[in-house]
Amino acid sequence: GVIQNGLYLGLIFLALTKIDSNVSVIIASILPLTVAFFSWVFFKSRLSLLGLSGLFVGLIGVLLIMIQRVEKEYEILGITLCIMGLLATTFSTLIITKININKNNILIVVGLQMLAGSLFLLPLSYFFEVWSISFNMTFLFTFLYIAAFPGIIGPVIWFYLQKEIGAVKYSSFHFLVPFFGIAISYFLLGETLTFSDMIGVIVIIIGLYLVNRDKKGF
């Protein structure tokens, strides 16, 4: 809870005040590679050439989609915060994979994780945040959406997949973040899809296929 909800999400939110969101997506997409590397360092886990190739192919697909969307200069502080957040979620992923969690208790674990993260952030927010909230429909919808999807549904799926398919194969699905981002932008915001976007999506799918064809896993 402290690592994932407190450090990772807290650092990413801070980073987004300093850098373009597209840059943060590119950095976050390195997660499968950092998980694979630290799994090898700490647990001597190995990924086959096929699986490793899939990770790099997926990352190339992400770059094809996102690099064209980086429009403004970025601050070194924002990059640093984003990398720290990446490392936090890397270690959180490895810890969850290795500890024994009963699948029937996942909701309880998610609740405790959110509680631990909120207790960690509460004193920090008291001293460093402005306690002023404008209660309106936009705030209410945003709050409920974040609580339901990133707060509850996402972590439940996160815990389940890590126990079922392993850390590296699970983290490889982070490559789909830019895909869903451009899909939502296209259908809801009317943004234009480029040829590079379509090629990037195809490359990401190939990368995911290669990773999940790897029988060794982690």
List each language-model region with its residue ranges.
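Specific transmembrane alpha-helical segments of multi-pass solute transporters/efflux pumps
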Residues: G1-A28, L64, A147-I165
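Hydrophobic transmembrane alpha-helices of multi-pass small-molecule transport proteins
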Residues: I30, F38, L47-I67, L86, ...
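Cytoplasmic-side transmembrane-helix entry/capping segments in multi-pass membrane proteins
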Residues: G1-V2, L47-G58, G78-I79, N104-Q113, ...
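Loop-to-transmembrane-helix transition segments
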Residues: G1-I12, L77-G85, S134-I153, H174
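Membrane-interface helix-cap regions at the ends of transmembrane helices
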Residues: G10-L11, F37, L59-E73, A116-F139, ...
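Transmembrane alpha-helical segments that form core, pore/gating elements
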Residues: V35-F37, V41, E73-F128, F143, ...
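Hydrophobic/aromatic residues within transmembrane alpha-helices
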Residues: A15, V41-F43, L47, I99, ...
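Hydrophobic/small/kink-forming positions within alpha-helical transmembrane segments
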Residues: V2-G6, G10, P32-F37, L63, ...
